[in-house]
Regions:
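Compositionally biased Ser/Thr/Gly- and acidic/asparagine-rich
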Residues: 2-240, 244, 248
Length: 250
């Protein structure tokens, strides 16, 4: 399910085992500042990722993959440096340590993934998923951290802040969207730290961080859930992006 992430396998405080270029890693360090040294050849050419899939209906797996290149790459749709099999989602998920949550990145925005950044990809209804990237995805952006691309979607961004952490959920409206989970345009909710607020919308029994819905005429109800383990003040901010002036969220 979307709430089952498996177990992290610790490599210890140091390792001489070569790090795979088609596998992502999570680095944790308790000190205020720390310098790590990575030694190896610069990567170039096509890289294929080894992903874990599942053939069961309605079962989702998340795979952590790296940007293998010494340059930023653009997370985008198939044909723009990426080759994705049918069961791989169009959104990716990047850990945001400041918010204590995952940020959902839609492929339609052409967002930059910096050097050394790992990202989660979703696989559903596919036992043997295939994903590869080539040099066409590379870009000369000097962005040190994840940077969102431009989007022209009609969308509502809701942000919850509490306990020095935050979470966002996005509701977008498009003519081609459906009420069900759209693998290439929607994003599943990935839960973050217990100390951080968790915000998501509900549709067709699924929890969404990015929910694309059909266009509507008069009014539309969207179910939203908020969870927190923290007792204290919570701030909600709503942003309307490319939505016409008469539209008002309630």
């Amino acid at each position: 399910s979307a709430n089952n992430y498996g177990l992290w396998v610790a490599l210890g405080t140091s390792t001489t085992t070569p790090l795979s270029t088609n596998q992502g890693y999570m680095i944790y360090y308790p000190e205020a500042s720390k310098t790590y040294t990575f030694v190896g050849n610069l990567n170039n050419g096509v890289y294929s990722y080894t992903l874990t899939g599942h053939s069961g209906t309605g079962v989702y797996t998340f795979n952590l993959i790296p940007n293998p290149y010494p340059s930023s790459i653009v997370w985008n749709t198939s044909g723009n440096g990426w080759t994705k099999s049918a069961g791989i989602g169009g959104s990716c998920y990047i850990w945001n340590a400041e918010n204590g949550n995952y940020s959902t990145i839609a492929s339609s925005t052409g967002s930059y993934i910096p050097v050394g950044q790992a990202l989660m990809v979703l696989v559903t209804n596919e036992a043997s998923p295939a994903l590869s990237v080539n040099n066409n995805a590379r870009t000369h952006s000097s962005q040190a951290f994840y940077k969102s691309g431009n989007s022209t979607e009609n969308k509502l961004v809701i942000r919850a802040s509490s306990n020095n952490y935050a979470d966002e959920t996005v509701v977008a409206f498009a003519e081609e969207a459906t009420e069900a989970f759209d693998l290439q345009t929607d994003g599943m909710k990935l839960f973050g730290l217990e100390e951080a607020p968790q915000l998501y919308t509900l549709s067709s029994g699924e929890k969404y961080s990015l929910n694309n819905l059909p266009l509507f005429q008069d009014q539309r109800n969207v179910d939203m859930n908020f969870e927190t383990q923290f007792t204290g003040e919570v701030t909600l901010n709503l942003s309307l992006i490319h939505i016409s002036e008469p539209t008002r969220p309630y």
